[in-house]
From Swiss-Prot:
Membrane topology annotation: Multi-pass membrane protein
Effect ascribed to mutating R50Q: In PNDM2; decreased inhibition by ATP; enhanced activation by Mg(2+); increased current
Disulfide bonds: C110-C142
Placement of sequence motif Selectivity filter: 130-135
Protein name (database record): ATP-sensitive inward rectifier potassium channel 11
Length: 390
């Protein structure tokens, strides 16, 4: 009979002994699928596409969109296939002219020094890449050889233009610049100017600026129309305020972008309790602008789910003036602090102003209580005697 130690691993036994048998077990709640990931990738899988030929109508964009291993494979195979194809053409020309058979005559060959397929392949590489070793060359004996030489040069230039252009576009893609455009991990909802506001922080790590930068926000949620139609991804635009009006921003330093939750806001009926149970809420943030150094339009994206929105908190300041210039402490980029915030929806706050007045009064009493603390009288370190004044 086998012992228990031989059947169950020791690590498993120690783990089970450390567990509390009275503590109930909970399975991790499955998180809602994001429409846009935190890194900006769209979480959409395209299936059952019937018209695959549409991708071949725009070959260049298809090549640029491919992954790097596939692009490098196509890059290598395009050159190898063209070299082999024209090597076969040069070998057939030499075979038809009788240049492959050894002869003692003085007949001039179509291409000198071609005696096998290997030499024809080397000559094909020399022609297309213009290496020019000088051991093989086309003569005036065969007009067809001259025509093949012209065609191979044209085809080689086309392959170079397409493939090298594809490699350049992949290395200079706009989303590379978006890697240094950062968003705060969490968004916050707090009072600003007496109104509930949805706020997030955005920054740029590079010194080169984003010209004509604009920012947009959308709420994506699952809705049902009065007719019973279920819309799984209903998108609603969110108006924003950034202190300068409009959606344009001057991103020379990290900015706090905020949206006033008013009657026109899709977040007007959002309560603090909904942030823990509202699984269909996702706020997408899109930052778009022109890269100053390259002139390419770039776009950075992120999203916030309901559990990534902090109620009653505010971002800490990270910009300070030092030695006549402004410095940014990115170690506190996503840090927040708790602030007094009503635990109600923006609609309830607009309908009952006493909630805001009570909160304002409570906030005003806080500093007064600190001031009423009795302070010990400081004893003087020296005294002046009357004799010294005489």
């Amino acid at each position: 009979m086998l012992s228990r130690k031989g059947i169950i691993p020791e690590e498993y036994v120690l783990t089970r002994l450390a567990e509390d048998p009275a503590k109930p077990r909970y399975r991790a709640r499955q998180r809602r699928a994001r429409f846009v990931s935190k890194k900006g990738n769209c979480n959409v899988a395209h299936k059952n596409i019937r018209e695959q030929g549409r991708f071949l109508q725009d070959v260049f964009t298809t090549l640029v969109d491919l992954k790097w291993p596939h692009t490098l494979l196509i890059f290598t195979m395009s050159f190898l296939c063209s070299w082999l194809l024209f090597a076969m053409a040069w070998w057939l020309i030499a075979f038809a002219h009788g240049d492959l058979a050894p002869s003692e005559g003085t007949a001039e060959p179509c291409v000198t020094s071609i005696h096998s397929f290997s030499s024809a392949f080397l000559f094909s590489i020399e022609v297309q890449v213009t290496i020019g070793f000088g051991g093989r060359m086309v003569t005036e004996e065969c007009p067809l050889a001259i025509l093949i030489l012209i065609v191979q040069n044209i085809v080689g230039l086309m392959i170079n233009a397409i493939m090298l252009g594809c490699i350049f576009m992949k290395t200079a893609q706009a989303h590379r610049r978006a890697e240094t455009l950062i968003f705060s991990k969490h968004a916050v909802i707090a009072l600003r100017h007496g109104r509930l506001c949805f706020m997030l922080r955005v920054g740029d790590l590079r010194k080169s600026m984003i010209i004509s930068a604009t920012i947009h926000m959308q709420v994506v949620r699952k809705t049902t129309s009065p007719e019973g139609e279920v819309v799984p991804l209903h998108q609603v635009d969110i108006p924003m305020e950034n202190g300068v009006g409009g959606n344009s921003i001057f991103l020379v330093a990290p900015l706090i972008i905020y949206h006033v939750i008013d009657a026109n806001s899709p977040l007007y009926d959002l309560a603090p309790s909904d942030l823990h149970h509202h699984q269909d809420l996702e706020i997408i943030v899109i930052l778009e602008g022109v890269v100053e150094t390259t002139g390419i339009t770039t776009q950075a994206r992120t999203s916030y789910l309901a559990d990534e929105i902090l109620w009653g908190q505010r971002f800490v300041p990270i910009v300070a003036e030092e030695d006549g210039r402004y410095s940014v402490d990115y170690s506190k980029f996503g840090n927040t602090v708790k602030v007094p915030t009503p635990l109600c929806t923006a609609r309830q706050l607009d309908e009952d102003h006493s909630l805001l007045e009570a909160l304002t009064l409570a906030s005003a009493r806080g500093p007064l209580r600190k001031r009423s603390v009795p302070m010990a009288k400081a004893k003087p370190k020296f005294s002046i005697s009357p004799d010294s004044l005489s």
